[in-house]
Amino acid sequence: MFKVRVIPCLDVKDGRVVKGVNFVGLRDAGDPVEAAIAYGAAGADELCFLDITATHENRGTILDVVKRTAEACFMPVTVGGGVRTVDDIRTLLNHGADKVSINSAAVSRREFVKEAAEKFGNQCIVVAIDAKRVARSGSDRWEIFTHGGRKETGIDAIEYAQEVVALGAGEILLTSMDRDGTKQGFDIPLTRAIADSITVPVIASGGVGNLDHLVAGIREGHATAVLAASIFHFGEFTVRQAKEHMARAGLPMRLDP
């Protein structure tokens, strides 16, 4: 049986962690490599870097972060943010990323997913979906939003997920824009609707406030992995506490001695 993955996410801007990471013993809470090493030691199954650098010219900083992290850590690393071309993907993989997450570029040009999967293999292509509940002609549905949730597309999230999987996406990183930052838990109906409609793993993201929310994302949302940021970054819970709690709830976890 597959093991459930717990994935901390670090937002990186100009080579620094935004909001910092509140771990005891970190020399520099703003250094993403320091944070990555700490998460690796804490038992994180994977790590996600989201590059939110405003300008494309500053991409060199995230490449340095990825390279140093790959040299220092043994867990898989996914990198997303501003990935627009096959060359962007190649460069990130060459610097040590295991997987690359694409978002807006896939929405605007679906063929990008197919090109990337054919060139690098679908196992390293993650499509990030930011979805929000929208009322249309009397009924609710989830739609895709881009540019950090600011730009609405009118695209149905479930249909889009099915489409990108058919084009070769190996994994879906699903964020509920309604829940993100609320600490009220994942949007379970959204997560389950997407997970049940496709054949590849779904990473649930957006809204984690306690450890039971992580369990619910898997058990009720049918996700295969959970991603969280602030509950780990600010020392509320450790990754190990999260994994032990999930194991006690009966979920199959990788627990290192």
Swiss-Prot record:
CDD domains cross-referenced by the UniProt entry: HisF
Protein's cellular compartments: Cytoplasm
This protein's record includes keyword Transmembrane helix: no
Molecular function terms from GO: imidazoleglycerol-phosphate synthase activity; lyase activity
Known partners and oligomeric status: Heterodimer of HisH and HisF.
NCBIfam families: hisF (TIGR00735)
Similarity remark: Belongs to the HisA/HisF family.
Record protein name field: Imidazole glycerol phosphate synthase subunit HisF
Gene: hisF
